[in-house]
Amino acid sequence: VYVNGKQVSQFDYLLKEDDLVEIKKENNLPLEILYEDQDFVVINKPSGLLSMSDGKEKEKTAYHYVSEYLKKQNKNQKVFIVHRLDRETSGVLMFCKNEKVRDLLQKDWNKIVYLRGYMALVEGKGLKKQGTLKNYLAESKTQQVYISNKEKGKLAITHYKVIKEMKNQTLLEINLDTGRKNQIRVQLSNINHPIVGDKKYGATSNPIRRLGLHAHAFGFVHPKTKKKYEFKTDCPKEFYGR
């Protein structure tokens, strides 16, 4: 309980006229809730946390923490995942509270979601100030995504803009037209600028001790109300170098 912005624990505390009383719920989640309403929960997922279970890890996932958080409010509340971020990617991740809205989103995902923005710290420098990467991507039996052709792969379109050049790295702002698995990681590796910390796709350095990819912006049109929602988070400070 807070009175005029200060926490109060005294059970017989006397209130005065015009005192502002606030009751704040404790939130011990290892992630930040950016927004919540009757249909959605939007979080800022930390790096290192799975979006949902991979069959091995069931409890320490964003899905698990959000589900437990909602069940404390309503034991019958369900949660549905509509998109994912890789374990080592941080940033904006959305969950649905009901199946109907989930289905509407998935049915017209590319029409409903109008903004998918990332910040990427890549190896090397010398990139054009801005550019567009277009490739066809396919996935091997070992879950390695690779550049393919039109017959075997799916089209992936990524736009980038140079934000800052450092001694051995470049910070990019990324916007997606498509949302293929590992899209940004594979396409940047293909132009010899892999994301730092991304050993899977050719990175040889890891100066920030994590994958240099952060989903900083996400925008969509509510499939029922047609209202626009847009969420943005700060780029991790370590991406800017010293």
Model regions: which residues?
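Pseudouridine synthases involved in rRNA/tRNA modification
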Residues: 151-157, 164-167, 171, 177, ...
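Short aromatic-glycine motifs in intrinsically disordered, low-complexity regions
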Residues: 143-152
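Short small-residue beta-strand/loop micro-motif enriched in glycine and branched aliphatics
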Residues: 49-52, 145-146, 170
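Conserved hydrophobic positions within beta-strands
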Residues: 33, 122, 159-162, 195
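RNA pseudouridine synthases
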Residues: 1-141, 237-241
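Glycine-anchored helix-breaking recognition loops at helix->coil/strand junctions
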Residues: 78-82, 146-147, 203
